[in-house]
């Protein structure tokens, strides 16, 4: 899926992928990041505290390098009670307990992501 998506993106396209909780399921989270990297995406992992889910992970991905510092465009600067340039950039500052861990690339022939999900989320029973 990600390979086909990458082939169809044009120009400076950027996608955001909702991954999972990098705190509860670090291998699952980093497996998704690594899978995006494996098909040629440049990635910027990030996280946010979501009230109904807790610490949640996402990743920005693009065929082109992503800037180290992001700025809200004027089109996105409508009324916001939360998001500022400073807060936006802090989302990409992963604390040590969310640091990258070893994980395999998810493929159709290994479905390792399913194993990671079962192992990590199943341990919460």
Give the residues covered by each predicted segment.
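A short glycine-rich, Lys/Arg-flanked "PGG" loop and its adjoining helix->strand segment in the class I
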Residues: 1-11
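Conserved Class I S-adenosyl-L-methionine
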Residues: 2-3, 27-47
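Acceptor-substrate binding/catalytic loop of class I
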Residues: 19-28
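Soluble small-group transferase modules, centered on the S-adenosyl donor enzyme superfamily
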Residues: 42-125
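Conserved beta-strand signature within the Rossmann-like core of class I S-adenosyl-L-methionine
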Residues: 12-19
